[in-house]
């Protein structure tokens, strides 16, 4: 009975993911129109040339695979260059949190912001820690750590793939990761997308270890370690619980109840205890005063409502809808109860009724299209004059403002307002199209293995989360990129001897 249920459920998952990946591939190709009509022509010619000269392409990939250290070293050089040359360093919410942590805002301002956005308190405390230790130099300590986080993720995913899949998969996942994330300025933006990347890679590694081991001889150290790691990672990025849910689901369908009870109980308890302990510490911190009033803080329901806005992340539309439930004379008050649960629930119901079944399907399709579209992973650093709360690079005025090389870097790699940025965007989109082809290839045939089912569930869970909650930005995929890259690499490389059935 359980075996039959497993075949049916994972068969349904396979069918859903195949449709999702067909859509992903088509969107990644058609997004070329947003870059330029010449981009479509150029991409078509390049892919045709690559097919005609596929032996040469294979040799080029093999050469890159043999020179991984050099490829990663080049990425580190790139990171240093863009970090030094950037003008706009941190933007939007990340800039508010940083300025508050480094005492560049009034305490009342950061208190008001964090009271409204308590999900950013862990990031504030993290940045405050480095400010207390290093003063203003704490910024550069964190940037070096960001470089460590992003590059360590490449190494861990490579080693994971070597152990659990095959060398070809390992080579591809390394090249994808370094090309998309390491050769990117995202690391210095101070979003919480980057720090958990190596932790997610470890989470996937240890989960795959446990799925591979003889269930009668599972290591207690690995079970407890996975639970502790997951609890810590959840504080940074709560969505990492999706990896654990996928792990528990695959373990459940094995039907070995003794092993499932042992592993699930210990990992659930350790994950829960660690997360609850750290979360309690965050909620009772005394570094910055937090106001506790009904309807002041943004809760989980609000992000479901935000996900129902036209693009899936339209803050102005969300606020405008909620203001309809507030008396006109109170709409400008700081704490007018805007985010009360009853108001949010009314607004969610209104939006769902307004969409109707077909409208909701269309909304989900559009939102998913925005989520998977961009090879730059949604990089959106515009010229400074368009930013509300910019934090300018301390090196800009004294060092790089009038430097020719720095201007060239900002023009071609950092500012999306510049027409020259489209060359970089085009190259990234080509890589994204190949990635999406790998994702599609992974589901063109059924791969009924525990390892693949686990990764597939982890990807599906991430996409489902972005469908229900705030979404519509490719940047939101970064938190799920390790499992996405693994599935794409498996699709391009195929499984060989190390499949685990």
Please give the residue ranges for each predicted region:
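Extracytoplasmic catalytic/substrate-binding loops of multi-pass membrane glycan-assembly enzymes
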Residues: 86-102, 106-140, 340-341, 357
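Loop-to-helix entry region of an early transmembrane alpha helix in multi-pass inner-membrane enzymes
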Residues: 117, 121, 135-152, 421-428
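Membrane-interface alpha helices of multi-pass inner-membrane proteins
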Residues: 221-237, 270-274
């Amino acid at each position: 009975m359980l075996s039959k249920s497993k075949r049916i459920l994972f068969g349904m998952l396979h069918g859903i993911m195949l449709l999702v990946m067909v859509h992903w591939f088509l969107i990644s190709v058609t997004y070329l129109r947003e870059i330029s009509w010449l981009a479509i022509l150029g991409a078509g010619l390049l892919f045709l040339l690559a097919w005609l000269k596929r032996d040469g392409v294979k040799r080029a990939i093999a050469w890159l695979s043999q020179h991984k250290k050099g490829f990663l070293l080049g990425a580190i050089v790139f990171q240093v260059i863009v970090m030094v040359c950037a003008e706009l360093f941190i933007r939007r919410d990340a800039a508010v949190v940083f300025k508050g942590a480094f005492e560049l805002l009034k305490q009342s301002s950061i208190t008001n912001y964090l009271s409204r956005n308590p999900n950013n308190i862990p990031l504030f405390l993290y940045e405050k820690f480095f400010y207390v230790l290093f003063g203003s130099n704490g910024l550069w300590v964190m940037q070096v750590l960001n470089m460590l986080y992003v590059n360590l993720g490449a190494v861990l995913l490579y080693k994971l793939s070597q152990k659990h899949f095959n060398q070809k998969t390992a080579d591809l996942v390394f090249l994808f990761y370094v090309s998309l994330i390491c050769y990117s300025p995202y690391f210095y933006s101070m979003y919480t997308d980057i720090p958990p990347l190596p932790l997610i890679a470890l989470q996937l590694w240890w989960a795959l270890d446990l799925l591979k081991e003889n269930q009668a001889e599972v290591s207690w150290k690995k079970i407890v370690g996975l639970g502790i790691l997951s609890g810590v990672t959840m504080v940074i990025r709560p969505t990492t619980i999706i990896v654990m849910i996928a792990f528990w689901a695959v373990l459940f369908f094995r039907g070995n109840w003794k092993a499932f009870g042992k592993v699930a109980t210990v990992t659930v308890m350790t994950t829960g205890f660690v997360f609850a302990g750290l979360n309690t510490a965050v909620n009772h911190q005394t570094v910055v005063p937090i106001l506790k009033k009904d309807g002041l803080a943004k809760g989980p329901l609000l992000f479901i409502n935000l996900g129902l806005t036209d693009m899936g992340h339209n803050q102005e539309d969300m606020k405008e809808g909620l203001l309809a439930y507030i008396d006109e004379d109170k709409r400008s008050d700081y704490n007018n109860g805007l985010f009360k649960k009853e108001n949010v629930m009314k607004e969610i119901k209104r939006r769902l009724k307004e969409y109707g079944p077909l409208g909701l399907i269309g909304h989900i399709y559009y939102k998913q299209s925005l989520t998977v579209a961009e090879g730059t992973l949604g990089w959106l650093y515009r010229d400074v004059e368009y930013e509300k709360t910019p934090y300018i690079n301390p090196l800009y005025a004294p060092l790089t403002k009038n430097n020719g090389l720095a201007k060239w870097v900002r023009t071609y790699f950092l500012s999306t307002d510049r027409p020259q940025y489209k060359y970089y965007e085009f190259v990234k989109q080509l890589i994204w199209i190949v990635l999406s082809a790998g994702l599609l290839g992974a589901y063109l045939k059924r791969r009924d293995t525990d390892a693949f089912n686990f990764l597939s569930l982890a990807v599906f869970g991430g996409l489902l989360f972005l469908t229900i909650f705030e979404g519509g930005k490719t940047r939101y995929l970064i938190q799920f990129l390790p499992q996405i890259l693994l599935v794409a690499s498996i699709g391009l490389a195929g499984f060989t001897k190390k499949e685990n059935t």
